[in-house]
Amino acid sequence: MASLSHILVLCVGLLAMVNAEAPQEHDPFTYDYQSLRIGGLIIAGILFILGILIVLSRRCRCKFNQQQRTGEPDEEEGTFRSSIRRLSTRRR
């Protein structure tokens, strides 16, 4: 009877060791939110700094007319006819 109990204890011990050493399956629904949050903050910071550099560099070329005003108003700036002239010259 003693040998039967020894065999039973040995089998239970082996089963416990096999279950403890078995590789755990990858659960596809377990997410690492900490690394996702850090990655998002890094990308947001890079885009923010890139936007500030673009604004400060003044190298962004726009299609519309970028003539700087000299501070003196045009002689016909406020009239309806001059606004029509300005619009018609832009289309050419």
Curated annotation (Swiss-Prot):
The modification Phosphothreonine is found at T79, T89. GO terms for biological process: negative regulation of protein glutathionylation; positive regulation of sodium ion export across plasma membrane; potassium ion transport; regulation of cardiac muscle cell membrane potential; sodium ion transport. Pfam families: ATP1G1_PLM_MAT8 (PF02038). The chain crosses the membrane at residues 36-56. Residues 65-92 are annotated as: Disordered. Its main location: membrane. Disulfide bonds: none annotated. One of its GO terms (molecular function) is sodium channel regulator activity. A lipid is attached at C60, C62 (S-palmitoyl cysteine). InterPro entries: FXYD_motif, Ion-transport_regulator_FXYD, PLM. In the brain, detected in cerebellum and choroid plexus (at protein level). It comes from the Eukaryota. Major plasma membrane substrate for cAMP-dependent protein kinase (PKA) and protein kinase C (PKC) in several different tissues. Phosphorylated in response to insulin and adrenergic stimulation. Phosphorylation at Ser-88 stimulates sodium/potassium-transporting ATPase activity while the unphosphorylated form inhibits sodium/potassium-transporting ATPase activity. Phosphorylation increases tetramerization, decreases binding to ATP1A1 and reduces inhibition of ATP1A1 activity. Phosphorylation at Ser-83 leads to greatly reduced interaction with ATP1A1, ATP1A2 and ATP1A3. The modification Phosphoserine is found at S82, S83, S88. It is a single-pass type I membrane protein. The keyword Ribosomal protein does not apply. Residues 1-20 form the signal peptide. Keywords: Cell membrane, Glutathionylation, Ion transport, Lipoprotein, Membrane, Palmitate, Phosphoprotein, Potassium, Potassium transport, Signal, Sodium, Sodium transport, Sodium/potassium transport, Transmembrane, Transmembrane helix, Transport. PANTHER family: PHOSPHOLEMMAN (PTHR14132:SF12), SODIUM/POTASSIUM-TRANSPORTING ATPASE SUBUNIT GAMMA (PTHR14132). Belongs to the FXYD family. Associates with and regulates the activity of the sodium/potassium-transporting ATPase (NKA) which transports Na(+) out of the cell and K(+) into the cell. Inhibits NKA activity in its unphosphorylated state and stimulates activity when phosphorylated. Reduces glutathionylation of the NKA beta-1 subunit ATP1B1, thus reversing glutathionylation-mediated inhibition of ATP1B1. Contributes to female sexual development by maintaining the excitability of neurons which secrete gonadotropin-releasing hormone. The cytoplasmic domain is sufficient to regulate sodium/potassium-transporting ATPase activity. Homotetramer. Monomer. Regulatory subunit of the sodium/potassium-transporting ATPase (NKA) which is composed of a catalytic alpha subunit, an auxiliary non-catalytic beta subunit and an additional regulatory subunit. The monomeric form associates with NKA while the oligomeric form does not. Interacts with the catalytic alpha-1 subunit ATP1A1. Also interacts with the catalytic alpha-2 and alpha-3 subunits ATP1A2 and ATP1A3. Very little interaction with ATP1A1, ATP1A2 or ATP1A3 when phosphorylated at Ser-83. Interacts with the non-catalytic beta-1 subunit ATP1B1. This is Phospholemman. It comes from Bos taurus (Bovine). The gene is FXYD1.
